[in-house]
Amino acid sequence: MSTEKINFDIHKILTLLPHRYPILLVDRVLELEPHKAIKALKNVTVNEPFFTGHFPKRPVMPGVLIIEALAQAAALLTFAEAQPKDPENTLYYFVGIDNARFKRVVEPGDQLILNVTFERYIRGIWKFKAVAEVDGKVAAEAELMCTVKTADAAP
């Protein structure tokens, strides 16, 4: 098992995730240690489309989108784990969430650090511990589960 830590930019992320604007929520992978963990970044800007309605007078990033950002980071870690034969035809389905907690608001100008740690793989389900932080303080945390399928396979 390698201890080399990998990082990559948005161009590499776009080759691995099918998400695109406005739902692509990972801007950069800061560190990826295969078989262990990923640390990724989401720059939160006032130009995000969800801020138009959530909330006009005090923009706050919706908690479900923080969880989605964590799930996308988990998908990138899963990609490093699973190493699919056909990455462009591979989808990561978010299949479960446990113990989600929201600890602080995330606002425009914040840098959301997405920390996801691999816990286990059982019967086709990947399980992760996920924590989103701003300025070193926990904004949200959850246990996430996903599965990997080819795009032409039924979910």
From Swiss-Prot:
Keywords: Cytoplasm, Lipid A biosynthesis, Lipid biosynthesis, Lipid metabolism, Lyase. This is 3-hydroxyacyl-[acyl-carrier-protein] dehydratase FabZ. GO terms for biological process: fatty acid biosynthetic process; lipid A biosynthetic process. Its EC number is 4.2.1.59. The active site is at 54. It catalyses: a (3R)-hydroxyacyl-[ACP] = a (2E)-enoyl-[ACP] + H2O. It is an enzyme of class 4 (lyase). Signal peptide: none annotated. The keyword Isomerase does not apply. The keyword Cytoplasm applies. The gene is fabZ. Belongs to the thioester dehydratase family. FabZ subfamily. One of its GO terms (molecular function) is (3R)-hydroxyacyl-[acyl-carrier-protein] dehydratase activity. InterPro entries: FabA_FabZ (IPR013114), FabZ (IPR010084), HotDog_dom_sf (IPR029069). NCBIfam families: fabZ (TIGR01750), PRK00006.1 (NF000582). GO terms for cellular component: cytoplasm; membrane. It comes from Burkholderia mallei (strain ATCC 23344). Involved in unsaturated fatty acids biosynthesis. Catalyzes the dehydration of short chain beta-hydroxyacyl-ACPs and long chain saturated and unsaturated beta-hydroxyacyl-ACPs. It is found in: Cytoplasm.
